[in-house]
């Protein structure tokens, strides 16, 4: 695989400036070297034995690789640290950027283990407590030259968290089969489909299905998964839930202070929470955000189902920690409390909202871990590279501007001389002639004006139709060349979005082999914030 680098803007201004190195990092983060961070972490203590005990039991049910189990054991050692990042439990792993985030975690962990000479464990935080199924219940595929969204219908109306939703084996198998039909048959299709069937057969829930695939894909690399909704993990988190509940007002104050500071610097707000938000969810089968009524001195849910005094909430956390989970503000705090975090791998959106957490971390006398932007890739297949060469377009041009403008320019250069001008002149002359006819009609009967104006519109519409008809015939005449532009757009910029946010990794595994992810993992990436163009 050949790699070239390209500078592309991120999805928000703050992340773009952070990646480019123009953001004033001291305003929102605690910049430090990995060596300095390691020294800081060694001064702190963690519930290592309890965490290792849980992770070993959790991964055993998935028959995780020896490499993963060995990495978990490393966490017992006081000098060990982690590189961590997370994502929702998307079906079939979701868009490519989830795979790229895991590759980023593993790659940075390996590099820092060599440089720091301490165990550095790659950890993936699976946000299995998320209940927004619309974000994970589909896969995009290419069908008839368009982006097609294949939704797994049993999840469409689900309100529960991914960790609690059991799979419908028959419906899931049919959904998988339909997706594979769009890929086309290759010499590895049957093997890959069987691979996914096996993952499905050993999975009970949506979260299990995700974890099984990831643990198989990255078995040799020893990736460790944290199931955020697991009841045994929640039991370990009990103590910190207590602290978060007690400190919710201070958390909100610190958050809002930092948000105002960033607003003064000209940055948009990324986290939107109510001033009364308690930053914890309570889940009795339905996940509800807790708020705090200062006048009544109690926690409550907006639907009025629950009200807790501070003491009652503490008792609930003590007796049923599995019913509580974090919001966008407290999840990073829980991660920091649980794991000796050498670095956090972040996507563009995460960079923006972590920037608002600096003072929240400081409230707990912590420094934020180094925030490392995840690797961002575009995969260029050989036939797409050939199409680019044929239409004299670079990857940079395709990713930055898309192909629409280039195609329109090519069509203008290959259409009859003065094509647009001829139709423009025809409309102008027809309007003049029709004006004469209308004046004649008005002399006969002034009431004809409305009818004649509508007739003028119909005449112009017919000229537009004729222009569109000739344009379509020109496109058909140049069909081979036009399709090259369309293929480029569909592959590299589907729906005018980054490739990594649309396509799924299974398409590429079906074309390039079951070891595709492993080969992608072993490309020599540079951590410089540049977008990577990978030629397959």
UniProtKB/Swiss-Prot annotation:
The EC number(s) this enzyme carries: 6.-.-.-
EC main group: ligase
MF terms (GO), sorted A to Z: ligase activity
Swiss-Prot/TrEMBL keywords: Ligase
InterPro entries in alphabetical order: Bacillithiol_biosynth_BshC, CC_BshC, Rossmann-like_BshC
Listed HAMAP family: BshC
Protein function: Involved in bacillithiol (BSH) biosynthesis. May catalyze the last step of the pathway, the addition of cysteine to glucosamine malate (GlcN-Mal) to generate BSH.
Family: Belongs to the BshC family.
Protein's recorded name: Putative cysteine ligase BshC
